[in-house]
């Protein structure tokens, strides 16, 4: 008597804590290294996003390509969506990096939008680096009306793939609708031919796969409609076209930013805060002068 008693809920909580401690203790050095690696990539990607630095963004690209792409071949895939739909998730103990990547992707999308697409995806990072290295004279920019229609293609692909999978249970369809497998260097002649065509086309149309064909991008685009922290717009954005012309993703239409297409690349946000480029700041700087001239 007089001794505190534990409820069933308290006992369950203690057991869960013991299981977590046991799980962490049972991890081998390779698994710990994987956790450190994914945390480093995700952490630096977010740091570069917060700082709005072009140099840091390209370092983040290099980390994603090297680690998530070439070393681990670990990208968010339509296969992950299949697994979630089936409730067929990997065991937590030996799949912590997977849960960290998926968790970060979903949470960051809800908070800021398609940050994964614009900063972390190894294939997206690769195409953005290629776009910077290749001569701009090779580039073909689709007219705005066509660009906005082509952007719907990825949603059709996502819907078609999901219907196919739910009807057949064949997850191998992913090999023909996304090129992420190429980092494993394991594909047949048809798959490599499709990837070759895609990469050649990307030389001429920047971010072609990400903008028009990526089913994962489509899924994250749908989630982005609920994004909490969106890019602000000034009143002058009604008529100014500077950010719209600078956007490489076709996500800006006049004063509106399509959150489903925006990958938070930072380009417009750097202009947005540049007092020498952004019309909003230029107008504010001229107002005091105008008032002085009027009063005199």
Segments from the language model and where they lie:
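Non-ligating segments of multi-cofactor redox enzymes
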Residues: 3-254, 260-296
């Amino acid at each position: 008597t007089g001794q505190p008693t534990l409820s069933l809920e308290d006992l369950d909580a203690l057991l869960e804590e013991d299981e977590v401690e046991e799980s962490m203790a049972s991890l081998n050095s390779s698994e710990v290294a994987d956790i450190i690696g994914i945390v480093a990539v995700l952490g630096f990607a977010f740091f570069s996003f917060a700082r709005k630095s072009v140099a840091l963004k390209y370092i983040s690209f290099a980390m994603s390509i090297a680690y998530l792409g070439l070393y681990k071949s670990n990208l968010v895939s339509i296969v992950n969506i299949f697994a979630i739909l089936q409730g067929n998730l990997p065991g937590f103990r030996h799949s912590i990096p997977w849960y960290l990547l998926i968790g970060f992707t979903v949470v960051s999308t809800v908070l800021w939008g398609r940050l994964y697409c614009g900063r972390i995806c190894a294939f997206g990072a690769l195409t953005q680096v290629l776009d910077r290295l290749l001569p701009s004279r090779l580039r073909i920019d689709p007219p705005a009306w066509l660009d906005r229609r082509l952007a719907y293609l990825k949603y059709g692909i996502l819907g078609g793939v999901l219907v196919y999978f739910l009807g057949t249970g064949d997850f191998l369809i992913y090999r023909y609708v996304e090129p992420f497998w190429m980092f494993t260097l394991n594909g047949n002649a048809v798959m490599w031919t499709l990837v070759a065509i895609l990469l050649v086309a990307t030389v001429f149309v920047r971010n072609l796969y990400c903008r028009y064909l990526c089913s994962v991008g489509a899924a994250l685009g749908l989630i982005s409609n609920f994004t909490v922290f969106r890019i602000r717009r000034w009143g002058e954005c009604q008529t100014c076209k500077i950010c719209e012309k600078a956007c490489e993703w076709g996500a800006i239409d006049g004063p509106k930013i399509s959150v489903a297409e925006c990958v938070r690349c930072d380009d417009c946000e750097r202009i947005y805060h540049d007092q020498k480029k952004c019309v909003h700041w230029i107008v504010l700087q001229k107002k005091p002068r105008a008032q002085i001239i009027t009063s005199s």
